[in-house]
Regions:
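Active-site His/Glu-centered metal-binding helix of metallohydrolases
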Residues: 107-116
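An acidic/histidine-cluster motif and surrounding catalytic segment
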Residues: 1-107
Length: 117
């Protein structure tokens, strides 16, 4: 059984209900089981601070993942604590407009991308 939460640090985003369904589908399709993780929706300022502190890049990014386990731990634990996936809503909106698709598609892409890292 998988357990994840989408934590929205910003305003109400109706697309997040559908993003959750996309993540459930990706987990099932990729046969990823017994994992726990969070997806945290933040703004450009917050994700830039994370990017600067942990990657030494002083600019916002669209998604950044923090793993709680090393790959070596995967085979030994019945439940895997994957960690946290931070997504910049500002970047997601910019990129959805740039690529001429919906915010739902962009948020879903970023969430799955962050999960599979």
């Amino acid at each position: 059984m998988n357990k994840f939460e989408i934590i929205n640090e910003l305003s109400n985003i109706e697309e997040l209900v559908e993003v959750k369904k996309v993540i459930d589908y990706a987990l099932k399709t990729e046969k990823i089981n017994n994992v726990i993780f969070n997806i945290i929706i933040v703004d450009n300022n917050y994700i830039q601070k994370l990017n600067r502190e942990y990657r030494k890049i002083d600019s916002p990014t669209d998604v950044i993942s923090f793993a709680l386990e090393d790959n070596d731990d995967i085979n030994y634990s019945p439940i895997r604590l994957l960690g946290d996936i931070y997504i910049s809503l500002d970047k997601a909106k910019e990129q959805a407009k740039e690529y001429n698709h919906s915010l739902l598609r962009e948020l879903s892409f970023l969430a799955v991308h962050g999960l599979l890292h």
